[in-house]
Amino acid sequence: MINKFFFKYTALFLLIILSYTVFLKAESISSYNQDNSSIKKLYETWHKAVESSNIDGYINSLDKNITLIPPGGPIISGAENYREFLGPVFESATYKIQDGEYDIEVIGDIAIVRSRQTVYLTFKDNANKIQSDGALQDNITTSDYLDVLKRQEDGSWKCLVHTWQLVPIK
């Protein structure tokens, strides 16, 4: 009798644990999908801002403590310093972005995003150089980007660290 009682409640306990584990896994998958979707939306609006030379829209994609680490240029810290960097960038050229796949890894309130993107630059008004050190200078540039994103208090994502490595032309 005790054996039957013990077996019955042990099986019930294991069933409850298993159900709870499945529930947590489903919740985790849902959260992962929601984060991925939000992050991809961030890049969509960020790229629209670049392609329309919208500095405010661009800055809206960045955490206030953004760090830009451009290859061949100085490290830029803070959204207002980044805004100053963008002035000559958008005054001198227009841009079109062809983005590749995003490799997104979310770790709590931080996300690491890797992607390969090609940027098409068209100089304006006889310009032939962007005056901001570290800005892209070639008409076509393919780069491997590495961004660190931070979840904001409202649950949205913004870029905390932005850097890239140029992909050599073969």
Describe the residue ranges of each PLM region.
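A beta-strand edge to alpha-helix "cap/lid" segment located at domain peripheries
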Residues: A26-N60, T67-K170
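Bacterial N-terminal signal peptides
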Residues: T10-T21
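Bacterial N-terminal signal peptides that target proteins for export
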Residues: I2-A11
